[in-house]
Each structure stands twice: as structure tokens, then as C-alpha cells.
Amino acid sequence: MTDTAPKAPVVDIPAITALVEPEVKALGLELVRIAMFGGKSDPTLQIMAERPDTRQIGLTECEALSRRLSEIFDEQDPIEDAYRLEVSSPGIDRPLTRRKDYQDWKGFSARIRLSAPLDGRKQFDGEIIGIDDADNVILDCPKVGQKILPFSAIERSKLLLTDALIAATQPLDSEGADQIVREG
């Protein structure tokens, strides 16, 4: 059976990053992730950013970054097809995309998916021990013990929502919460 679902446009993520990163830094933020997802009928370019000191971002900062990026993308036109721009915080069950994330979130539970199987499996859930000098993420997995996962082999990774994570992650404030509109 072939997958006939329309795919999101293929984009040059390094070229997009080169446009986005200076704007993110100009606002005192750090870039967490750039991703393109959705089908051909509703492609979305997602930009995740955060304040380095709090690992969060407020609604006002998301709006400011979105405006700056919209202007640049309108001028540079880095994506041929129509798409939607989404600027957001990484959220509580955030993706782990940078080496420093594995140090910053050590002691918390994560799900890591590898691009190729290791010991017969591609997905590992466990507590983050950290990242070593050889660029390996160390994860303590229930039932299988410690796993050493090469950072370069990670396809995607995210924190798992646990009581410990909820207790450790407090929102900065509720600014803009009354402006949230649910679609659908």
C-alpha cells in the first residue's frame, strides 16, 4: 500500500535557520526547533523559541517574533508554496533538539526515537542521565537499564509529561490566556 497523503512542501531548513536565528537572538531568545509539517493543503512552518533564563516564552514575544519573521519571509520568500507560520514555546513536554537540552533536563523522563534500531529497537523511554563528552545521550530505561544513544542517531526526542515535570515547570504568568481562541 502506498501513502497517497499529500506531503508538506520540502524546505531548506538550514536556509530558514539562517534567516530565523538572527531575529530570535535579537529578541534575546534561543531557537529550539524549526519544523515543517502538515499536508500539501495545510503546510505549517513551526518555529519554537524560548528565553534562555526561563526556558519559556510569553505571548508578547511570540507575537513580536512572528511579525519580524513574517516581514523577512515576505521579503526573502524562502518557501515557494503557501504555508502557515506558527511561532510558539516548546511547551511542557518539549522536544529535545540540542545537546544542552539533555544536560538541562537531566533527571526527567524522555522518549527518544532513533533513525536506526539499536539492540533491536528504535524507541527508548527513560530518565535522562545526561550527555557525555563523546556526544552520547545516556538514558536510564526501566527493565533494560542504562542506554547510550549517539546524539547523531536521534530522529526525534521529547520530554514525557510526568508529575515531576509538572512540579518543576511553572508558567511565567498567564499573560494572554484570556485571548486564547480554540479552532474547530
From Swiss-Prot:
Query: Per UniProt, what is one Pfam family of this protein?
Result: RimP_N
CDD domains given for it?
Answer: YlxS_C
The listed locations are: Cytoplasm
Tell me one GO biological process term. Answer: ribosomal small subunit assembly
Gene3D superfamilies in alphabetical order: RimP-like superfamily, N-terminal
Keywords in alphabetical order? Cytoplasm, Ribosome biogenesis
Q: Would the keyword Cytoplasm turn up in this protein's UniProt record?
A: yes
- Cellular component terms per the entry's GO annotation: cytosol
Q: What does this protein do?
A: Required for maturation of 30S ribosomal subunits.
**Which family, according to the similarity comment?**
Belongs to the RimP family.
| NCBIfam families, per the entry | PRK14636.1 (NF011229)
Protein name as it appears in the record: Ribosome maturation factor RimP
Task: Write the lineage as a comma-separated list.
Answer: Bacteria, Pseudomonadati, Pseudomonadota, Alphaproteobacteria, Sphingomonadales
